[in-house]
Amino acid sequence: MAPADGESSPPPHVAVVAFPFSSHAAVLLSIARALAAAAAPSGATLSFLSTASSLAQLRKASSASAGHGLPGNLRFVEVPDGAPAAEESVPVPRQMQLFMEAAEAGGVKAWLEAARAAAGGARVTCVVGDAFVWPAADAAASAGAPWVPVWTAASCALLAHIRTDALREDVGDQAANRVDEPLISHPGLASYRVRDLPDGVVSGDFNYVINLLVHRMGQCLPRSAAAVALNTFPGLDPPDVTAALAEILPNCVPFGPYHLLLAEDDADTAAPADPHGCLAWLGRQPARGVAYVSFGTVACPRPDELRELAAGLEASGAPFLWSLREDSWTLLPPGFLDRAAGTGSGLVVPWAPQVAVLRHPSVGAFVTHAGWASVLEGVSSGVPMACRPFFGDQRMNARSVAHVWGFGAAFEGAMTSAGVAAAVEELLRGEEGARMRARAKVLQALVAEAFGPGGECRKNFDRFVEIVCRA
């Protein structure tokens, strides 16, 4: 409701709707914190909506990192997860299904009411949220507020999800027979093959919860989003991808990598938690001589592939830092951990401060699953990559790294010891690797320019703040 003549508009109240699984909520919280700081002069307040378990994890992470307390104008608001109270242990896919069913059945509307109550009755003026939670679009409309979704993955993957119906009509049931066919008839996707598409677009179980979710999201975004935040920066996406997205989503606002939004002295890169001594170990290694290995918190190679990877790292002769869940250590070759520790040639840890590790001058190669957050952290650190994708959008990301941007290599299928050794050797010391390293430095410079004073990502984030707060 517009204010009466002579009355001032109430300050903005932004509801931030999280997808409470994997790293999604943490990424959205980093944006919310930056938004809260930027919007404070307008008197804006933010309500961050997520489930009890998600908020508990975020609080734990915040307390473990210096400077990560919530701004005074940002509050947590707990929302139901949709799971029956009697069920103590629910598999994650089922948790996602229950959460989305609750969201679609009017849950988001109730969450916005909870945000209003937590804000002392201040109505929600804008709904920002993870694009995965597409039912927020209708809830925002019912509240008379715009919906501004945040996309956390690559632009090419978003384009594929939006064009899913057209891709399915084109490929039909022939995906297995057309895996190497380039998608030349689909604007923005000509650099990718059928095999590179995310799971559930033209192959896999279309009814799996995540595949259903992103399909509905892709249908919803073009008709309902007031603007869409993109996790990219000018100069990264090829012009055909940018043009194709702009035609479908005219109000795209790119200001990624999102982890760079917070000021340096406010981020954990200033004094990162490093309980396993990764940075001290790196300080004893040669410049650009270390291979850093991490597949994130979800993806993990099969036991035989883990052993091949370990053997390949040893065979490369390069020092390595490997972040690997401790429950997988028993799968490594006999004596591998002892040899690495005894010679000082390798360090295996259950967790590493990845951003700080990639920025360390001793790291010269990154062996990764090609999750988008990891790709952007590598790009912003100028580190070339060897990608072993597993699922989701990781195949598209790996294709981008190796064939679109040219600052790394991609394994086609499982890693072998010989393949790992060759990839690490090439990235660190090879002739082709030199070109990849140079390309990585070019992209790193583009990121630095975009986030520098007057840079395009800084300008775009200011525009995002204006869109969110003017409602």
UniProtKB/Swiss-Prot annotation:
Keyword entries, A-Z: Glycosyltransferase, Transferase
EC class (word): transferase
Top-level lineage group: Eukaryota
This enzyme's EC code(s): 2.4.1.115
Binding site for an anthocyanidin: 24, 161, 392
Listed Pfam families: UDPGT (PF00201)
Annotated GO MF terms: anthocyanidin 3-O-glucosyltransferase activity
GO BP: anthocyanin-containing compound biosynthetic process
Coiled-coil features, chain-numbered ranges: none
Catalytic activity, as annotated: an anthocyanidin + UDP-alpha-D-glucose + H(+) = an anthocyanidin 3-O-beta-D-glucoside + UDP
Binding site for UDP-alpha-D-glucose: 152, 352, 354, 369, 372, 374, 377, 393-394
Active-site positions on this chain: 24, 130
Gene3D superfamilies, alphabetized: Glycogen Phosphorylase B (3.40.50.2000)
Family listed: Belongs to the UDP-glycosyltransferase family.
Function: In the presence of other necessary color factors, this glycosylation reaction allows the accumulation of anthocyanin pigments.
Name of the protein in its database record: Anthocyanidin 3-O-glucosyltransferase
Species, as recorded: Zea mays (Maize)
